[in-house]
Amino acid sequence: MRLSVVALLALCSALNAGDVPGLVKEKPASGPCVQVDGQYMVPYTVTIPGTDVKFEMIPVPGGEFLMGSPDSEPGHQPTEGPQIRVKTRPFWMQKTEISWADYKPYMALYNVFKKFETENIRPVTDEKMIDAITAPTELYEPTFTFEFGESPDLPAVSMTLYAARQYTKWISIVSGQQYRVPTEAEWEYAARAGSDSAYSNGDDPAKLGEMAWFADNSQGKGPRKVTAGKPNAFGLIDMHGNVAEWVQDELSEDGYAKLKDKAAAGPLSVFDVMGKPAVHYPRVVKGGSWQSTAEECRSAARLGSNYALWKDTDPNLPKSPWWMTDEPCRGIGFRVLRSIDELPRDQIETFWNVDSEDLKLDVDGRILGGRGGYGIVDQDLPEAIRKFKSGEK
């Protein structure tokens, strides 16, 4: 039976009272776990429906932390202050960055959706648009994107924030669990893993190489396998370096100044910090990459996206909403997060869909020009793809 976004949200709510991936009633004898609401969050494995691709989700405890960096921290930038106290509920975060193995099934949907459109299979009507996504068109210059390889265990890179968000909508609906990109506060909390230092393993940049793959040790060789690094105290790999990671927040020139008065009354929620992003760019990218200096890999470091530069050599008009063509794009990826508390429909859609007028114009322009398209996502999609490829009716 087809599962829509509405049904997904209802299912997720119902499952919270029963058998849910990553939640158990008894405390495990070993391994990481987080007690919450009389149950225990534990690691679990996601298998992308219709594939044999798997990735692991790790429970992260809730808590409070000081977000941003003090003026005295080497590498501090004005947009990292003033520091504010933030609280977060527990969540699961992907253990590694999204790999090409994880991302390519989503990339493959572009040709699937175009063929479905030609054959009038699973047509996208107005009433079904709530369940629709776009899939990334084929790469303009794959030799550039894949210069350092496209091995399944290398991190997927050069996708836009919009593409990352559409990926999370797809995997949420086909899997029956609600995934999204992290807020910046959630990401930084997970990266710090209980630390208040510049890096999760201290303040000394000379020791960063123990955990991170960045300019000093990558030597321009490109990213490493997503499982190659040493986990932080929460069990997450490469929160510093390898590839920088998209988060949902926009970047303001005054940093967290607009939140200072509100934060004086007590810790802010991660959604208070995020606000309501409404600009196409700059959006925040966190963690630094194999191209970055140690200071650019700090937990508090913030990189603002600049699509005017990062898509400079894209010859298309409008430029691709799904891919970037210029550095530092080969050092940018993402990882997914799942909240312990499912978000209501109107809120989760802000994490999944178009959220700025400029982006809407780009997406609409590409689709009207025949260089993009929509497809319906539900739990029947993997079987529909299988039947189509095998010639079954």
Q: Where does each model-flagged region fall?
A:
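Bacterial N-terminal signal peptides
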Residues: 4-14
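Surface-exposed recognition segments
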Residues: 18-19, 78-84, 195, 243-378, ...
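Active-site microenvironments of metalloenzymes and redox enzymes
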Residues: 18-25, 69-75, 87-201, 249-253, ...
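Primarily auto-inhibitory N-terminal propeptides
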Residues: 18-46
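Short aromatic-glycine motifs in intrinsically disordered, low-complexity regions
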Residues: 41-55, 142, 324
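Mature N-terminal segment immediately following signal peptide/propeptide cleavage
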Residues: 50-67
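Well-ordered beta-strand positions in beta-sheet-rich domains
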Residues: 57, 64, 83-85, 90
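Functional-site microenvironments in short loops/helix caps that host divalent-cation chemistry
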Residues: 66, 70-71, 141-307
